[in-house]
Curated annotation (Swiss-Prot):
It comes from Bacillus subtilis (strain 168). Its EC number is 7.6.2.-. The lineage of its organism: Bacteria, Bacillati, Bacillota, Bacilli, Bacillales. The keyword 4Fe-4S does not apply. The complex is composed of two ATP-binding proteins (NupO), two transmembrane proteins (NupP and NupQ) and a solute-binding protein (NupN). This is Guanosine import ATP-binding protein NupO. The keyword Ribonucleoprotein does not apply. One of its GO terms (molecular function) is ATP binding.
Length: 510
């Protein structure tokens, strides 16, 4: 059997944690091989070893049967290995073509031969079905197009083995379909692909084999045709995982949040929320369903004080809170799990223990007379780290070093521990594995069952249908329908999200 990549007994450790513990990975020529594991299982670390970003303490790497020492990404490129990182590495002010050729520019008379560069980029683009605009600035193209540019960068450098690190985490459903077709085209052309992921549906749809990693150890390698999502999920987390969220019927109480006719503008001054009204009661989860870009983000920002409203009112337990400061709104009884945990949820270069106290550090017993009591802060942080199973070497580890799932658990613990009357959860499971998703869902339902009001924003229809007691459909900044998840389907919901009336959606669904 011809293996293009063999990683044998790879060990890589960081202070306080063994990320890869004698892992083996063998990739066949012309296959799409999934590397599956929870957030923090060691998948990206293993691939960073293969790409020369990390050096292992032990183990052997073979490329096309030959033992190699990969001490830098340049060495990996020379061996035909390319990596499409989860966080793209493009220069915003450069054109797509300039980004692709950066570092390997074709020269003519000592100067960059732009005509030849553009033609070479176009030729590769046409060959692999990666349609792009070479002269467009990287900052001006969609996330999906930026990813195509990253793929073309690896192909331009002659990669035969491509590593994709969580490639669908930031893509729309349509862009995900396009990416899967691109991967199929690459394999047809003789390329081999390693796909780092925790999305089981994608593995079943596109991969040939899968290697499961759990807590830094290689668990099993399987043919995808011989397994199923349930088996993969249990191998990944070490126990059975429920894909269906269990919850009893809601018992709504008094109105907690009342939004009445608000209008909100985005950063360009364009109205993105228009005369919108919505209510959330104690003891219920209200889900907001809509295609991204229809005013959801601005709505959440207005409720949490991150954006001004131009008209209308927002009341919490009968008191108006619109246009108050974020701290005053928080102290009035709102917890916020933000859509972008890095931008609005954490200070990445602070210890995770201090991040957990970001909403409370100025209160007793953590602060007195302007002096922080670090001992009390870290004592509280340790208890929440244990309660919410935040996997970290210790409470002093910087938030940046934690996996996405553990970062999210820390945020959820911080917000729920404050005992808010209204919990706003915006994209709470984005980028998380099935085990972490199950954990988040249980916590949201626990809040509902404790009599709290929960406002859920998600672009995952399955999540909205599973968790919500009521679904409010947003389109072009307005709530155009309110539906009972027990009485609708994903198809009908999708039509409503595209702007159909309830009557039209019902007919199409019928």
């Amino acid at each position: 059997m011809e293996y293009v990549i063999e990683m044998l007994n790879i060990r890589k450790a960081f202070p306080g944690i063994v990320a890869n513990d004698n892992i083996n990975l063998q990739v066949k020529k012309g296959e799409i091989h999934a590397l599956l594991g929870e957030n923090g299982a060691g998948k990206s670390t293993l691939m960073n070893v293969l790409f020369g970003l990390y050096q292992p303490e032990r183990g052997e790497i073979r490329v096309r049967g030959e033992k190699v020492h990969i001490n830098s990404p340049n060495k990996a490129n020379d061996l035909g290995i390319g990596m499409v990182h989860q966080h793209f590495m493009l220069v915003d002010t450069f054109t797509v073509a300039e980004n692709i050729i950066l570092g390997k520019e074709p020269k003519k008379f000592g100067r960059i031969d732009r005509k030849r560069a553009g033609q070479e980029v176009q030729d590769i683009s046409d060959r692999y079905g990666l349609q792009i605009h070479p002269e467009a600035k990287a900052a001006d193209i969609s996330v999906g197009m930026q990813q195509r540019a990253e793929i073309l960068k690896t192909l331009y450098r002659g990669a035969d083995i491509l590593i994709f690190d969580e490639p669908t985490a930031v893509l729309t459903p349509h862009e995900i379909k396009e990416l899967m077709q691109i991967m199929k085209n690459l394999v047809k052309e003789g390329k081999s692909i390693i796909l780092i992921t925790h999305k089981l549906k994608e593995i079943m749809e596109i991969c040939d084999r899968v290697t499961v990693i759990r807590k830094g150890k290689g668990i099993k390698t399987l043919d995808v045709r011989d397994t199923n999502q349930d088996e993969l999920a249990s191998l990944m987390v070490g126990r059975e995982v429920s894909f269906k969220t269990e919850k009893r019927a809601a018992q709504p109480g008094a109105e907690v949040l009342a939004i009445d006719g608000i209008t909100v503008k985005d950063t360009r001054g364009i109205e993105t929320v228009r005369d919108l009204s919505l209510s959330v009661k104690a003891g219920e989860i209200v889900g907001i369903a809509g295609v991204d870009g229809n005013g959801q983000s601005e709505l959440i920002e207005a409720v949490t004080g991150l954006r001004k409203t131009d008209s209308g009112t927002i009341t919490l337990n009968g008191k108006q809170i619109q246009n108050l400061t974020p701290r005053k709104i928080t102290e009035s009884g709102i917890g916020h799990i933000p859509q972008d945990r890095h931008k609005h949820g954490l200070v990445l270069d602070f210890p995770i223990g201090e991040n957990i106290l970001l909403q409370s550090y100025y209160k007793k017993p953590y602060s007195a007379l302007g002096v922080l009591h670090k001992g009390e802060m870290y004592k509280k942080a340790r208890s929440l780290i244990t309660e919410y199973d935040v996997r970290t070497p210790d409470e002093y580890t910087h938030a940046r070093a934690l996996s996405g799932g553990n970062q999210q658990k820390a945020i959820i613990g911080r917000e729920i521990d404050r005992n808010p009357d209204l919990l706003i959860a915006a994209q709470p499971t984005r980028g998380l594995d099935v085990g972490a998703i199950e954990f988040v869902h249980k916590k949201l339902i626990e809040q509902r069952d404790a009599g709290k009001a929960v406002l859920l924003l998600s672009f995952e229809l399955e999540e909205i249908m599973n968790l919500s007691d009521r679904i409010a459909v947003i389109f072009e900044g307005r709530i155009i329908a309110s539906v009972n998840p027990q009485e609708t389907t994903e198809q009908e919901l999708g039509l409503l999200m595209a702007g159909s009336t309830q009557k039209e959606a019902g007919k199409a669904n019928g």
